[in-house]
């Protein structure tokens, strides 16, 4: 979300003729790639937005709780429902969606996202898995545009099908 906001600021700066600010924020809008972990695999898909510590190391285990004795942790996964029962809906790294959802929420750089995912065919497969395995959550803003991403791989028919499925699931027909 920060990268998208940086992109929006860049566009405003460009419109105001502030070239230096435009360049600065346009560059910052690519920072989502710093959190893209290409080697991480989940549900047969590689590449996710994942947390790093302040030294830049990937965080595979997340500390949870305030115990000074046990220092409890749990292994991080890109979906919240795989965490322990005491894991909050949002944890300290993601606010309102899962890594699966945020990894598809790069609306200002969809071509870059498709490239990170391994090309159009892999991206199409990734979208299928995302929807078929139930990782899509219509209640989360980062997922709102995801059904339309099939357009970017030449499959607007699949976008239409997914949107139709979503509508039917919401009105329970």
Describe the function of each predicted region.
Residues 10, 14-151, 156, 160, ...:
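Catalytic cores of carbohydrate-active enzymes
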């Amino acid at each position: 979300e920060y990268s998208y906001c940086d992109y929006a600021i860049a566009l405003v700066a460009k419109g105001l003729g502030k070239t230096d600010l435009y360049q600065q924020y346009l560059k910052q809008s690519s920072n989502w790639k710093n959190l893209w972990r290409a080697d991480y695999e989940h549900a047969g898909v590689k590449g996710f937005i994942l947390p790093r510590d302040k030294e830049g190391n990937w965080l595979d285990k997340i500390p949870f709780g305030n115990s000074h004795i046990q220092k409890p942790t749990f292994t991080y996964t890109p979906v919240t429902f795989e965490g322990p029962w005491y894991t909050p809906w949002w944890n300290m790294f993601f606010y309102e969606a899962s890594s699966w959802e945020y990894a598809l929420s790069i609306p200002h750089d969809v071509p870059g996202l498709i490239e990170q995912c391994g090309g159009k065919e892999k991206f199409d497969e990734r979208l299928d898995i995302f929807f078929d395995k139930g990782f899509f959550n219509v209640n989360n803003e980062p997922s709102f545009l995801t059904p339309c991403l099939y357009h970017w791989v030449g499959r607007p028919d699949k976008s239409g099908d997914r949107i139709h499925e979503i509508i039917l699931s919401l009105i329970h027909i």
